[in-house]
Amino acid sequence: MTIPCALPRSLQGYRYHPAPSASSRPVRGRLAPSPPGYMHLGNAWAFLLAWLAVRSAGGTLVLRMEDIDPQRSRPEYARALVEDLRWLGLDWDEGPAVDGAIPDEGDMAEQGPCGPYFQSARAALYDATLDAMDRAGLVYPCYCTRKELRQLAGAPHVDDAGAPYPGTCRHLSPEERRQREARGRRACLRLRCPEGRFHFQDGLLGEQSFTLEDCGGDFALRRSDGVVAYQLAVALDDALMGITQVVRGRDILTSTPRQLALLRLWGFEPPAYAHIPLLLDGQGERLAKRHQSLGVRELRRQGVAAAEIVGVLARLAGLRPDMRPLAAADLLADFRLERLPRQDVCLRDLPCVPDWLRPLCLPC
């Protein structure tokens, strides 16, 4: 299989699973946890709905560990995530520990044609792709610090993945770049974003249309510390793994036009996207790592059954009229992605809050 467009010649022998057309079945979906911590209920919510979307369509499910940041990811978190997914009744066909064997130490065995399935083992692939894009003039070095970006863009929160960027370094001359490097400035790599609108049909939210300017302008593909950015790693892995369906939280909605831009530059067919509502605590805030006291691992330790968690999540998603315990597989027969709520879901909406969930259910 020839890798198209800007991807480097060295990748042409890389294992590439071509995505079928949108009308082809079965679908290929993915679970893509990142291991900077243990799984919380918000993660479980997203993984359950993504799993149901693939399995209800008779599709193939890939588990990909998004551990690209070495400073935040730890092997014990990756093993715990796999254990918790299994405990919740979620399985997969490709990736680590397909057979359920999770060693206490060392690497988990992988199964499938598109590995490696840990992003940390795919760094050479990302670097080769960036080198090819650099040679093609698609990227440029940016020497701006976060402080400078805040001052330039008036943005209170700036990060490498999606800060509003005014294009300060886009047209620097070679001499201006040398001057910055001589002062010890380290550069990230940014995409020269194409103009125009990116349209896509979201499986839950309907027709979507963005310009990349709407999403912050030229975005980083590699951070100044050398770590590849989320947008590049995810888009490239989805393409090379033949992913045709991506179900994820609506907080990542504006990542989609960025990933569509990359896929278009590389010549890949994009997957179908569906952005699901977020799960909120009783104060109306998104469940996140600060809620680890009520993470899946802690709930297991307290004796809460997986079926109880699935039952509550099913009720919140509108998949069941009550919260009776049940297995994830029990939801498959009647699951329809388009029936999920469009608005974020608050735990306080439950008609009767289980005791184990009460700490998260202060009034919104």
Mark where each language-model region is.
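Short, surface-exposed acidic
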Residues: 93-95, 270-273, 319-326
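Short linear loop/turn motifs
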Residues: 99-114, 147-150, 277, 313, ...
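Active-site cores that bind ATP or allylic diphosphates and position pyrophosphate for catalysis
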Residues: 147-288, 295-300, 352-364
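Alpha-helical structural motif
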Residues: 77, 125-129, 165, 255-258, ...
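Short secondary-structure transition/capping segments
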Residues: 114-131, 157-160, 185-195, 316-330
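N-terminal Rossmann-like or analogous alpha/beta NTP/dinucleotide-binding catalytic cores
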Residues: 2-157, 250-251, 255-268
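Noncatalytic linker/hinge segments flanking ATPase motor cores
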Residues: 40, 103, 112, 116-120, ...
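Non-catalytic terminal extensions that flank enzyme cores
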Residues: 1-38, 56, 61, 177-179, ...
